[in-house]
Amino acid sequence: MGAAARLSAPRALVLWAALGAAAHIGPAPDPEDWWSYKDNLQGNFVPGPPFWGLVNAAWSLCVVGKRQSPVDVELKRVLYDPFLPPLRLSTGGEKLRGTLYNTGRHVSFLPAPRPVVNVSGGPLLYSHRLSELRLLFGARDGAGSEHQINHQGFSAEVQLIHFNQELYGNLSAATRGPNGLAILSLFVNVAGSSNPFLSRLLNRDTITRISYKNDAYFLQDLSLELLFPESFGFITYQGSLSTPPCSETVTWILIDRALNITSLQMHSLRLLSQNPPSQIFQSLSGNGRPLQPLAHRALRGNRDPRHPERRCRGPNYRLHVDGAPHGR
């Protein structure tokens, strides 16, 4: 039975009516880009998460997939794996540079071709190359992350999207193949202090340059290792992209120690518009997919639940940075 056949009658009626209306309003949308986190934008239907797998056959996994993301991580289900090595970041000893974009869906940082930034270790058997840093956040504090821990959300989630450079030549090819992608997620809370890396992205001089959709601003001299806590544990599972086409080729690595940004920085994020300046303001906030069933997937972690009182200490709980002057 196809995805459309399993669609409930009310949702089917809404979809068919909306598609019929869309057919009479201007040119046809690009099928590869016709999706949103909200079903209604400026009075026009744009497929939100419940409809992603129904408007494009290439996105069918968004409806029928059994390894979808994001998920709610219940810590009691996490299996301690003492053989997980520490995560390793390779920057070649160079500072990161690239372009910060307002894509209309996310705040996105696309690194320049050089230096190449790779991540390995942890659950990864291959080296993965950084392709994008993506920031998701909510309209209110504590409700902006895609993933949850013990049913608890966070104000924002930073996702570092990597592709398997040993098996694939680029992100697009890796999205279509097995063992293709690795996404590192870091959760963000609102507090009185701010993570130094995020402060570079969210200071007033920078964030006001990307107020509207398609705005872009070039940044340089970024130290990516400053994004990570000094010490941390992580939880990993097999999942999918949380945007169309929802490909089930992602190894997710969730860092279990949250970062901080200030309330002013969070407010500045919520003032970003998902539209160009010629259109009505709609906040970029609320740019996450709803939770998906974990089902029978395994959750593995490198923190020993038999000793929850112990803080993460030692080299296994630090990011190993190749090429840094003194490492971490």
Curated annotation (Swiss-Prot):
Indicate whether Thylakoid appears among the record's keywords: no
**Keyword Transmembrane helix annotated:** no
**Domain Alpha-carbonic anhydrase span(s) in chain numbering:** 33-303
Region spans: Disordered: 300-328
Composition-biased stretches (Basic and acidic residues): 319-328
Q: Where is the signal peptide?
A: 1-22
Q: Which Gene3D superfamilies match?
A: Alpha carbonic anhydrase (3.10.200.10)
Q: Which GO terms describe its cellular component?
A: basolateral plasma membrane; extracellular region
> Where does it reside?
Secreted
Q: MF terms per GO, please?
A: hydro-lyase activity; zinc ion binding
The protein's superkingdom reads Eukaryota
Q: Which residues are glycosylated?
A: 118, 170, 260
Ordered alphabetically, the record's keywords are: Glycoprotein, Secreted, Signal
Q: What job does the chain carry out?
A: Does not have a catalytic activity.
Regarding protein family, the annotation reads:
Belongs to the alpha-carbonic anhydrase family.
Q: What protein name applies here?
A: Carbonic anhydrase-related protein 11
Q: From which organism does this entry originate?
A: Bos taurus
Q: What is the lineage of its organism?
A: Eukaryota, Metazoa, Chordata, Craniata, Vertebrata
The gene for this chain is CA11
